[in-house]
Regions:
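Helix-loop "lid/cap" segments that line or gate small-molecule binding pockets
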Residues: 22-23, 43-57, 111, 143-144
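An amphipathic alpha-helix signature
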Residues: 16, 20, 33, 37, ...
Length: 210
């Protein structure tokens, strides 16, 4: 199972643009892509909370609505899959594949469809699918159950500690990618760390043989 943002697709610019649209009327500091990258990972609700001060927390609902209004209309204006993602998915033909995102399910599906990636997956779930989001084990176990697998034969691939923690709690192997939104140092808890998604194909074969 794959994380979405920062693992399959670089969505940082479009998320940054949506955040800046949301906060513009309130005179808040304009965010750079680098600012946004530090905030991404726990879903839209937490994303908005992180940019609000305690005094401004009453604006959360309004900012979320403005964010979603803009983001849903500009979903793939700048977003694109990372290098070799399609090639890797095409080469993983013998395994069931799923997407496990902290982005809302409808947005996750639209993003993957518009980028021509949805056809590679047996299941796509978002933050609102299983009742909980990463780093909870619940969405991981939900996917395992839906696909008729066991934790022992499952792998989660992601770019953040949320992915690693969710995988560990669910008892699945964890693979961290270093090309996403987090540093290699922050990913050291993963069972495996890869710099290029193409490394996943031989790694999956190796894990399946053990």
């Amino acid at each position: 199972m794959f994380d979405l943002d920062g693992t399959l697709v670089n969505t940082a610019q479009d998320i940054t643009n949506a955040l800046n649209f949301a906060i513009k009327p309130y005179g808040m500091k304009i965010l750079t892509v680098e600012d946004t990258i530090q905030l991404i990972g726990e879903g839209i609700s937490r994303l908005v909370e992180k940019i609000l001060s305690v005094e401004n927390m009453h604006l959360k609902s309004e900012l979320m609505n403005r964010f979603l209004e803009y983001y849903s209309e500009h979903l793939i204006e700048h977003s694109k899959e990372y290098p070799h993602v399609k090639e890797t998915l095409e080469n993983l033909t013998t395994v069931k594949k799923a997407v496990i995102s902290n982005k809302r399910e409808d947005l996750s599906k639209r993003l993957l469809e518009e980028l021509g990636l949805s056809e590679y997956f047996d299941l796509i779930i978002g933050s609102d699918t299983a009742g909980e989001r990463k780093p909870s084990a619940v969405p991981v176990l939900y996917i395992i159950s839906r696909l008729g697998l066991s934790p022992e034969e499952s792998i989660i691939v992601g770019d953040s500690n949320y992915d690693i923690e969710a995988g560990e709690k669910a008892g699945v192997k964890t693979v961290a990618v270093t090309y996403g939104y987090r540093s290699r140092e922050s990913l050291m808890g993963a069972d495996y760390i890869i710099d290029d998604i193409r490394e996943l194909v031989p790694l999956v074969n190796e894990i399946s043989e053990t």
